[in-house]
Design a protein with these regions (language model features):
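A short, surface-exposed alpha-helical micro-motif characterized by mixed small hydrophobic
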Residues: 219-221
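Conserved ABC ATPase "signature" region
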Residues: 33-41, 120, 132-149, 166-168
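Pre-NBD coupling/linker segments of ABC/ABC-like ATPases
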Residues: 1-51, 240-255
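Conserved ABC ATPase "signature" C-loop
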Residues: 231-232, 247
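H-loop/switch region of ABC-family ATPase nucleotide-binding domains
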Residues: 213-214
């Protein structure tokens, strides 16, 4: 997915100010209408879950930032807020320039369409005209390694093929800001290295990167800054060389075990 949330910031700049976001919890499945009405009248329903609590970040153009934390710490919620998928309850978010979010690869695919047709569809959704998509078609197909299957319906693809096509499309979009959430475990080890190399090319071209991953080694070799979230709050923001030891202590993970 790509989006534009400029709001007066420079291309590649990200601003998050006092951001808070809560989600309602629905534990209503399997209950009758009467039980729902009585339960809500008595208890008012479960309280909302606070995914982000007064989080502020400023990321300069070209920075590479990793976001780490326990499950449920607010990492994915942060990327969804930055991408414009999820609105804030309070606070401000602004991302300058073209934002490319790799959160759920292939989420917008038409399963009855071929891989090639989905490239055209997704390219158009990201603002590319037909001529621009055609110019990138060969590179996308080559990167995906789906040459023999590109004209088959994606419904016939394996999960790995599906994800490879999704990454290949996203990797060939013009990006001022890259938002990546746990999507680099795509395909075999050789393909993963190719994905990392492509991201490195985009960073070298000036793109800002915000990466969410449980892979500590990936964060350390890709990012220069790390943000640690816990319970929806920012508890560390600084150089990766200081942040990852802090994260390992938080998780109770010895650094020598976390390293590959």
């Amino acid at each position: 997915m790509s989006a534009r949330l400029d709001d007066g910031v420079r291309p590649g700049e990200i601003v998050l100010e006092h951001a808070s976001r809560a989600f309602s919890v629905r534990a209503d499945r399997g209950r009758s209408l009467k039980e729902l009405l009585i339960g809500r009248a008595r208890a008012g329903g479960p309280p909302p879950v606070e995914a982000l609590k007064d989080v502020s970040l400023r990321i300069e153009p070209g920075e590479t930032v990793g976001i780490v934390g326990r499950n449920g710490a607010g990492k994915s919620s942060t990327l969804r807020v930055l991408s414009g998928i999820v609105p804030l309850n309070s606070g401000r978010v602004a991302c300058g320039g073209q934002v490319v979010a790799q959160l759920e690869l292939g989420a917008g695919f038409g399963r009855d369409f071929s891989g090639r047709e989905n490239i055209f569809l997704n390219g158009a959704l990201h603002g590319l005209v037909k001529e621009q998509i055609e110019e990138r078609m060969a590179a996308i197909v080559e990167f995906s390694e789906l040459d023999d299957f590109i004209d088959a319906p994606v419904a016939t693809y394996s999960s790995g093929m599906f994800l490879r096509l999704g990454f290949a499309i996203a990797a060939h979009l013009d990006a001022d800001v890259l938002l990546i959430d746990e999507v680099l475990a795509v395909g075999d080890e050789a393909f993963q290295r190719k994905c990392e190399a492509r991201i490195a090319e985009q960073i070298a071209a000036g793109a800002t990167l915000v990466l969410v991953s449980h892979d500590a080694a990936l964060i350390e070799r890709t990012c220069r800054r790390v943000v640690v979230l816990d319970g929806g709050r920012k508890i560390f923001d600084g150089p990766v060389g200081e942040g990852m030891p802090f994260y390992h202590r938080l998780m109770g993970t010895p650094e020598e075990v976390a390293a590959p």
